[in-house]
Protein backbone atom coordinates (compact mmCIF):
# COMPACT_ATOMS: atom_id res chain seq x y z
CA UNK A 1 0.00 0.00 0.00
CA UNK A 2 1.34 3.41 -0.94
CA UNK A 3 0.86 4.92 2.53
CA UNK A 4 3.51 2.51 3.83
CA UNK A 5 5.90 3.07 0.91
CA UNK A 6 8.77 5.38 1.86
CA UNK A 7 8.74 7.05 -1.56
CA UNK A 8 5.19 8.27 -0.91
CA UNK A 9 6.65 10.68 1.65
CA UNK A 10 9.07 12.38 -0.71
CA UNK A 11 8.48 15.88 -2.06
CA UNK A 12 10.47 18.61 -3.76
CA UNK A 13 11.33 21.70 -1.73
CA UNK A 14 13.08 24.69 -3.33
CA UNK A 15 16.28 25.43 -1.40
CA UNK A 16 15.30 29.05 -0.84
CA UNK A 17 12.40 27.89 1.37
CA UNK A 18 14.75 26.27 3.90
CA UNK A 19 14.92 28.78 6.76
CA UNK A 20 18.51 29.53 7.75
CA UNK A 21 17.51 32.18 10.29
CA UNK A 22 14.42 32.70 12.45
CA UNK A 23 11.81 35.35 11.79
CA UNK A 24 12.07 38.16 14.33
CA UNK A 25 9.98 39.18 16.12
CA UNK A 26 8.69 35.64 16.62
CA UNK A 27 5.04 36.66 16.21
CA UNK A 28 5.65 37.59 12.57
CA UNK A 29 6.34 34.00 11.49
CA UNK A 30 3.62 32.66 9.23
CA UNK A 31 1.07 30.14 10.46
CA UNK A 32 -1.07 27.79 8.39
CA UNK A 33 -4.17 26.63 10.28
CA UNK A 34 -5.92 23.50 9.03
CA UNK A 35 -9.35 22.75 10.51
CA UNK A 36 -10.28 19.12 9.86
CA UNK A 37 -13.96 19.56 10.68
CA UNK A 38 -14.60 22.38 8.23
CA UNK A 39 -11.82 21.27 5.84
CA UNK A 40 -10.63 24.89 5.72
CA UNK A 41 -7.15 26.40 5.60
CA UNK A 42 -6.41 29.80 7.14
CA UNK A 43 -3.21 31.75 6.51
CA UNK A 44 -2.21 33.96 9.41
CA UNK A 45 0.77 34.74 11.68
CA UNK A 46 1.84 33.58 15.12
CA UNK A 47 0.60 36.73 16.81
CA UNK A 48 -2.87 35.16 16.40
CA UNK A 49 -2.00 31.56 17.26
CA UNK A 50 -3.79 31.49 20.63
CA UNK A 51 -7.00 32.73 18.99
CA UNK A 52 -7.27 29.33 17.31
CA UNK A 53 -6.56 27.17 20.37
CA UNK A 54 -9.72 25.35 21.58
CA UNK A 55 -10.63 26.88 24.94
CA UNK A 56 -11.10 23.58 26.77
CA UNK A 57 -7.94 21.90 25.48
CA UNK A 58 -5.02 21.00 27.70
CA UNK A 59 -1.87 22.49 26.15
CA UNK A 60 1.20 20.27 26.56
CA UNK A 61 4.70 21.77 26.27
CA UNK A 62 8.16 20.19 26.16
CA UNK A 63 10.54 22.15 28.40
CA UNK A 64 13.78 20.45 27.36
CA UNK A 65 16.82 22.69 26.99
CA UNK A 66 19.33 22.36 24.15
CA UNK A 67 22.95 21.72 25.10
CA UNK A 68 25.84 23.35 23.26
CA UNK A 69 26.55 19.89 21.97
CA UNK A 70 29.16 20.54 19.25
CA UNK A 71 32.76 20.62 20.49
CA UNK A 72 35.86 21.27 18.41
CA UNK A 73 39.26 20.03 19.50
CA UNK A 74 42.65 18.81 18.34
CA UNK A 75 44.15 15.32 18.40
CA UNK A 76 47.41 16.87 19.62
CA UNK A 77 47.71 18.82 22.86
CA UNK A 78 49.65 21.77 21.47
CA UNK A 79 48.08 22.21 18.04
CA UNK A 80 46.21 25.52 17.84
CA UNK A 81 43.88 24.34 15.06
CA UNK A 82 40.76 22.59 16.31
CA UNK A 83 39.54 20.52 13.39
CA UNK A 84 38.12 17.45 15.13
CA UNK A 85 34.39 17.77 15.77
CA UNK A 86 32.74 15.94 18.66
CA UNK A 87 28.93 15.87 18.67
CA UNK A 88 27.75 15.09 22.18
CA UNK A 89 24.64 12.85 22.12
CA UNK A 90 23.88 11.88 25.72
CA UNK A 91 25.43 10.77 28.99
CA UNK A 92 26.14 7.07 29.33
CA UNK A 93 27.31 6.62 32.92
CA UNK A 94 29.67 8.32 35.33
CA UNK A 95 31.93 10.60 33.28
CA UNK A 96 31.32 8.87 29.95
CA UNK A 97 29.15 9.94 27.04
CA UNK A 98 27.87 8.70 23.71
CA UNK A 99 29.11 10.93 20.90
CA UNK A 100 29.69 11.15 17.18
CA UNK A 101 33.19 12.15 16.05
CA UNK A 102 33.95 13.31 12.53
CA UNK A 103 37.00 11.83 10.82
CA UNK A 104 39.17 8.83 11.56
CA UNK A 105 39.38 7.92 15.21
CA UNK A 106 40.36 4.85 17.22
CA UNK A 107 40.06 3.67 20.79
CA UNK A 108 42.70 5.31 22.96
CA UNK A 109 42.85 8.54 20.95
CA UNK A 110 42.57 11.79 22.86
CA UNK A 111 40.95 15.04 21.76
CA UNK A 112 42.16 18.24 23.42
CA UNK A 113 39.88 21.24 23.91
CA UNK A 114 42.45 23.42 25.71
CA UNK A 115 45.55 22.89 27.86
CA UNK A 116 43.44 21.27 30.61
CA UNK A 117 40.35 19.68 29.15
CA UNK A 118 40.38 16.61 26.94
CA UNK A 119 38.33 13.56 26.01
CA UNK A 120 39.54 9.99 25.53
CA UNK A 121 37.90 7.61 23.08
CA UNK A 122 37.05 4.45 25.01
CA UNK A 123 35.16 2.40 22.44
CA UNK A 124 33.96 2.53 18.84
CA UNK A 125 30.35 1.34 18.83
CA UNK A 126 28.65 -0.49 15.98
CA UNK A 127 26.10 2.27 15.29
CA UNK A 128 28.68 4.95 14.52
CA UNK A 129 28.66 6.31 18.05
CA UNK A 130 31.82 6.72 20.11
CA UNK A 131 32.00 6.19 23.85
CA UNK A 132 34.27 8.82 25.39
CA UNK A 133 35.37 10.04 28.82
CA UNK A 134 36.11 13.67 29.72
CA UNK A 135 39.04 14.83 31.84
CA UNK A 136 40.43 17.94 33.47
CA UNK A 137 44.12 17.07 33.25
CA UNK A 138 43.99 13.51 34.65
CA UNK A 139 40.85 14.01 36.75
CA UNK A 140 37.62 12.54 35.35
CA UNK A 141 34.81 15.07 34.96
CA UNK A 142 31.40 14.30 36.43
CA UNK A 143 28.20 15.09 34.55
CA UNK A 144 27.79 18.52 36.12
CA UNK A 145 31.28 19.57 35.04
CA UNK A 146 30.85 18.07 31.57
CA UNK A 147 27.81 20.31 31.12
CA UNK A 148 29.95 23.28 32.22
CA UNK A 149 32.57 22.26 29.65
CA UNK A 150 29.90 22.14 26.93
CA UNK A 151 28.58 25.54 27.96
CA UNK A 152 32.08 27.06 27.87
CA UNK A 153 33.45 25.48 24.69
CA UNK A 154 30.44 24.08 22.87
CA UNK A 155 28.46 25.38 19.92
CA UNK A 156 24.71 25.20 19.37
CA UNK A 157 23.92 22.04 17.38
CA UNK A 158 22.16 23.57 14.39
CA UNK A 159 20.53 20.98 12.10
CA UNK A 160 22.58 19.78 9.11
CA UNK A 161 20.28 21.49 6.60
CA UNK A 162 21.20 24.92 8.02
CA UNK A 163 24.32 25.56 5.98
CA UNK A 164 26.14 28.01 8.23
CA UNK A 165 28.10 28.07 11.45
CA UNK A 166 26.22 28.87 14.63
CA UNK A 167 26.15 32.54 15.63
CA UNK A 168 25.51 34.39 18.88
CA UNK A 169 21.79 34.74 18.13
CA UNK A 170 21.40 30.95 17.97
CA UNK A 171 22.24 30.62 21.67
CA UNK A 172 18.82 32.10 22.50
CA UNK A 173 16.80 31.72 19.28
CA UNK A 174 17.47 27.96 18.99
CA UNK A 175 16.07 27.61 22.50
CA UNK A 176 12.46 27.97 23.65
CA UNK A 177 11.65 30.72 26.14
CA UNK A 178 10.38 28.02 28.52
CA UNK A 179 13.42 25.71 28.18
CA UNK A 180 14.29 24.43 31.65
CA UNK A 181 15.89 20.96 31.83
CA UNK A 182 19.11 20.61 29.86
CA UNK A 183 19.73 17.49 27.79
CA UNK A 184 18.53 17.93 24.18
CA UNK A 185 20.77 18.06 21.11
CA UNK A 186 18.03 19.55 18.95
CA UNK A 187 15.29 22.04 19.74
CA UNK A 188 11.61 21.09 19.85
CA UNK A 189 11.06 23.55 17.04
CA UNK A 190 7.36 24.38 17.36
CA UNK A 191 8.28 25.81 20.77
CA UNK A 192 10.64 28.33 19.19
CA UNK A 193 7.69 30.38 17.92
CA UNK A 194 6.64 31.48 21.40
CA UNK A 195 7.77 34.85 22.70
CA UNK A 196 7.68 35.53 26.43
CA UNK A 197 4.51 37.57 25.90
CA UNK A 198 2.68 34.79 24.02
CA UNK A 199 3.82 32.19 26.55
CA UNK A 200 2.54 34.24 29.49
CA UNK A 201 -0.83 34.65 27.78
CA UNK A 202 -1.00 30.91 27.08
CA UNK A 203 -0.20 30.00 30.69
CA UNK A 204 -2.80 32.47 31.94
CA UNK A 205 -5.64 31.53 29.59
CA UNK A 206 -5.26 27.76 29.05
CA UNK A 207 -4.88 24.60 31.08
CA UNK A 208 -1.34 23.41 30.54
CA UNK A 209 1.19 20.76 31.50
CA UNK A 210 4.94 20.47 31.06
CA UNK A 211 6.98 17.38 30.29
CA UNK A 212 10.60 16.88 29.24
CA UNK A 213 11.62 14.87 26.19
CA UNK A 214 15.33 15.32 25.50
CA UNK A 215 15.39 15.42 21.71
CA UNK A 216 18.17 13.12 20.50
CA UNK A 217 20.46 13.14 17.49
CA UNK A 218 18.27 10.47 15.91
CA UNK A 219 15.71 13.15 15.12
CA UNK A 220 17.87 14.08 12.08
CA UNK A 221 18.02 10.51 10.78
CA UNK A 222 15.74 9.72 7.88
CA UNK A 223 13.64 6.60 7.50
CA UNK A 224 15.57 4.16 5.32
CA UNK A 225 13.36 1.07 5.12
CA UNK A 226 11.24 0.83 1.97
CA UNK A 227 8.25 -0.18 4.10
CA UNK A 228 8.02 2.48 6.81
CA UNK A 229 6.46 -0.02 9.23
CA UNK A 230 9.83 -1.77 9.45
CA UNK A 231 11.69 1.35 10.63
CA UNK A 232 13.14 1.28 14.15
CA UNK A 233 12.98 4.74 15.63
CA UNK A 234 15.57 6.10 18.07
CA UNK A 235 15.05 6.12 21.84
CA UNK A 236 14.89 9.37 23.81
CA UNK A 237 14.86 10.17 27.51
CA UNK A 238 11.42 11.29 28.72
CA UNK A 239 10.38 12.65 32.09
CA UNK A 240 6.79 13.44 33.05
CA UNK A 241 6.33 14.85 36.57
CA UNK A 242 3.55 13.30 38.67
CA UNK A 243 1.56 16.53 38.55
CA UNK A 244 1.60 16.52 34.75
CA UNK A 245 0.72 12.81 34.72
CA UNK A 246 -2.37 13.49 36.81
CA UNK A 247 -3.47 16.30 34.50
CA UNK A 248 -2.91 14.16 31.40
CA UNK A 249 -4.91 11.26 32.84
CA UNK A 250 -7.90 13.52 33.45
CA UNK A 251 -7.81 15.41 30.15
CA UNK A 252 -10.05 14.44 27.24
CA UNK A 253 -8.94 17.17 24.83
CA UNK A 254 -5.19 17.68 24.27
CA UNK A 255 -3.23 20.14 22.13
CA UNK A 256 0.49 19.46 21.82
CA UNK A 257 3.12 22.08 21.12
CA UNK A 258 5.30 20.10 18.74
CA UNK A 259 5.78 16.50 17.69
CA UNK A 260 8.03 15.75 20.68
CA UNK A 261 5.22 16.65 23.09
CA UNK A 262 2.76 14.61 21.01
CA UNK A 263 4.98 11.52 20.92
CA UNK A 264 5.50 11.82 24.67
CA UNK A 265 1.78 12.01 25.40
CA UNK A 266 0.98 9.11 23.09
CA UNK A 267 3.72 7.00 24.69
CA UNK A 268 2.57 7.80 28.22
CA UNK A 269 -1.16 7.34 27.61
CA UNK A 270 -0.56 3.86 26.21
CA UNK A 271 1.16 2.63 29.37
CA UNK A 272 -1.05 0.47 31.56
CA UNK A 273 0.11 1.49 35.03
CA UNK A 274 2.88 4.09 34.90
CA UNK A 275 4.39 4.34 38.37
CA UNK A 276 7.51 6.35 37.63
CA UNK A 277 8.45 9.74 36.19
CA UNK A 278 11.33 8.66 33.90
CA UNK A 279 10.85 6.71 30.68
CA UNK A 280 12.63 5.70 27.48
CA UNK A 281 10.39 6.87 24.64
CA UNK A 282 10.65 5.07 21.31
CA UNK A 283 7.18 5.45 19.82
CA UNK A 284 6.94 5.76 16.01
CA UNK A 285 3.59 7.16 14.88
CA UNK A 286 2.38 6.58 11.33
CA UNK A 287 -0.74 5.44 9.50
CA UNK A 288 -0.40 1.87 10.79
CA UNK A 289 0.21 3.13 14.35
CA UNK A 290 -2.13 6.12 14.47
CA UNK A 291 -2.53 8.91 17.00
CA UNK A 292 -5.05 7.89 19.66
CA UNK A 293 -4.93 10.43 22.48
CA UNK A 294 -3.93 13.83 21.06
CA UNK A 295 -6.53 16.00 19.34
CA UNK A 296 -4.57 18.99 18.06
CA UNK A 297 -0.99 19.73 17.05
CA UNK A 298 1.16 22.80 16.50
CA UNK A 299 4.18 21.88 14.41
CA UNK A 300 6.64 23.07 11.78
CA UNK A 301 7.01 21.83 8.19
CA UNK A 302 9.14 18.68 8.11
CA UNK A 303 11.74 17.03 5.89
CA UNK A 304 10.83 14.61 3.09
CA UNK A 305 10.81 10.94 4.14
CA UNK A 306 11.11 11.88 7.81
CA UNK A 307 9.34 10.16 10.69
CA UNK A 308 7.83 13.53 11.61
CA UNK A 309 6.20 13.89 8.20
CA UNK A 310 4.75 10.41 8.76
CA UNK A 311 3.43 11.54 12.15
CA UNK A 312 1.60 14.45 10.51
CA UNK A 313 0.19 12.04 7.92
CA UNK A 314 -1.02 9.81 10.74
CA UNK A 315 -3.04 12.76 11.99
CA UNK A 316 -4.56 14.13 8.79
CA UNK A 317 -3.86 11.49 6.12
CA UNK A 318 -1.13 11.24 3.50
CA UNK A 319 -3.00 12.93 0.65
CA UNK A 320 -4.10 15.88 2.80
CA UNK A 321 -0.53 16.28 4.07
CA UNK A 322 0.77 16.42 0.50
CA UNK A 323 -1.95 18.89 -0.46
CA UNK A 324 -1.15 21.22 2.45
CA UNK A 325 2.60 21.03 1.86
CA UNK A 326 2.03 21.89 -1.80
CA UNK A 327 0.02 24.94 -0.76
CA UNK A 328 2.68 25.94 1.78
CA UNK A 329 5.36 25.79 -0.92
CA UNK A 330 3.23 27.83 -3.32
CA UNK A 331 2.62 30.42 -0.58
CA UNK A 332 6.38 30.59 0.17
CA UNK A 333 6.18 29.31 3.72
CA UNK A 334 9.60 28.77 5.29
CA UNK A 335 10.43 25.16 6.17
CA UNK A 336 12.18 23.19 8.92
CA UNK A 337 13.56 24.24 12.32
CA UNK A 338 13.67 28.01 11.89
CA UNK A 339 10.67 27.99 9.56
CA UNK A 340 6.98 28.81 9.79
CA UNK A 341 4.35 26.70 11.49
CA UNK A 342 1.18 24.69 11.01
CA UNK A 343 -1.69 24.23 13.44
CA UNK A 344 -3.85 21.12 12.99
CA UNK A 345 -7.31 21.40 14.56
UniProtKB/Swiss-Prot annotation:
One GO cellular component term: cytoplasm
EC number(s) per entry: 2.4.99.17
Pfam families registered for this protein in UniProt: Queuosine_synth
The entry's keywords: Cytoplasm, Queuosine biosynthesis, S-adenosyl-L-methionine, Transferase
GO biological process terms, semicolon-separated: queuosine biosynthetic process; tRNA wobble guanine modification
Subcellular location: Cytoplasm
Record-annotated disulphide pairs: none
Catalytic activity: 7-aminomethyl-7-carbaguanosine(34) in tRNA + S-adenosyl-L-methionine = epoxyqueuosine(34) in tRNA + adenine + L-methionine + 2 H(+)
Pathway(s) annotated for this protein in UniProt: tRNA modification; tRNA-queuosine biosynthesis
Any one GO MF annotation of this record: S-adenosylmethionine:tRNA ribosyltransferase-isomerase activity
UniProt cross-references to InterPro entries, sorted A to Z: QueA, QueA_dom1, QueA_dom2, QueA_sf
Family membership: Belongs to the QueA family.
Oligomer and partners: Monomer.
Stored PANTHER family: S-ADENOSYLMETHIONINE:TRNA RIBOSYLTRANSFERASE-ISOMERASE
Job description of the protein: Transfers and isomerizes the ribose moiety from AdoMet to the 7-aminomethyl group of 7-deazaguanine (preQ1-tRNA) to give epoxyqueuosine (oQ-tRNA).
Full protein name: S-adenosylmethionine:tRNA ribosyltransferase-isomerase
Organism: Helicobacter pylori (strain P12)
Amino acid sequence: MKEFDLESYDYYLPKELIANYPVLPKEKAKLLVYDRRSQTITHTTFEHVLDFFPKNALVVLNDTKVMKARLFGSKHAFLPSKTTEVFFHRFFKDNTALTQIKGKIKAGDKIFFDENYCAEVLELLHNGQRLIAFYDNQTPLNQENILKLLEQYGHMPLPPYIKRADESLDAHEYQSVFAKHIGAVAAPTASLHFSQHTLEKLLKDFKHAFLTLHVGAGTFLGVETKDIREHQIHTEVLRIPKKSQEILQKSQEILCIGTTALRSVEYFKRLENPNQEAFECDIFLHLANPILHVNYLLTNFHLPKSSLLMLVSAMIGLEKTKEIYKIAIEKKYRFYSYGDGMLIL
